[in-house]
């Protein structure tokens, strides 16, 4: 079952999620929208195993990285992005 990985613009560019991922799903890409000048990206979301370690590692109040397991979607959870 595939999982969906979403990175929101609340990302502060700290790299915690990238370092926490055991499957190398996330990477940092250049972005001018935060002080760090980079944002997490999920180019290999198909490799996500759904462990949610990236969510646990995220230091922002609203998790900048979210993993939606299988049939979960932002709509079914009442979230927007």
UniProtKB/Swiss-Prot annotation:
Binds 2 [4Fe-4S] clusters. Cluster 2 is most probably the spectroscopically characterized electron acceptor FA and cluster 1 is most probably FB. [4Fe-4S] cluster 2 binds at residues 21, 48, 51, 54. Its cofactor is [4Fe-4S] cluster. Residues 2-31, 39-68 form the 4Fe-4S ferredoxin-type domain. Its main location: plastid. [4Fe-4S] cluster 1 binds at residues 11, 14, 17, 58. Disulfide bonds: none annotated. This is Photosystem I iron-sulfur center. The gene is psaC.
